[in-house]
Amino acid sequence: MSIFNYTEEQMAAASSTFTIHEIYQQPATWRKTCAQLAACKDELQKFLDQVVKAEDFDIVLTGAGTSEFVGNSLYHALNKKYNFKVKSYASTDIVPNPEDTLSRTKPTLLVNFGRSGNSPESVGSVEAAEVVCENIYHLFVTCNSEGALSKLADKHDNCFALNLTPETHDKSFAMTSSYSNMYL
C-alpha cells in the first residue's frame, strides 16, 4: 500500500509508519467523531447543563503537553460562547496550586483532554479539583476507553467520559488523529 507516494517499506525505513497512517486517516476519524458526538448530544448537553445553566460558573480546559493545546485552541471560541467564563490551564499548573486556577464556590466544569487519559497530571488535576471545588463536574475527552479518566467516569456521577474511537489513540510520538479529534 502507498500513502502520500510512500511505500510501506519507505515509511518503515524512515520510522514514520504510524505518523503517516495517522495523518492519512484523519478525515475518516473526523467523520466517526462527528457521528459519535451526534449520538450522545442529548446526554452530553444534559450533563453540561448542570454547570452552564447556573448564573455564574467556570469552564476550565486542561491537559498536559499537546493535550493542553487542544484547550488553548478552543479557548477563544468557547469563551465568547459562554460569556467569558472559560479558562485554559495546563494540568501541570492545576496540580501544584489548584486554588490559583479553580474556584472553590462557583459551579465548575473541568474539561480534561488526554490522549491516553492516564497521565499523572490528568488524574492529579481531577483529584485536586475534587478537594478544592465545592461544585465540580468533569468532562473527559480521551482517545482511550481503558484509561484512568474513563474509569473514573464509570464510578462518579459528576463525570462524563467522551471516549473517542480506538484509532484516534495514536501510536506515533506526534499527536495527529488524537489532537484533531479531541479538538472536534
Where are these regions (language model features)?
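Glycine-rich phosphate-binding loops that contact phosphosugars or nucleotide phosphates
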Residues: 53-184
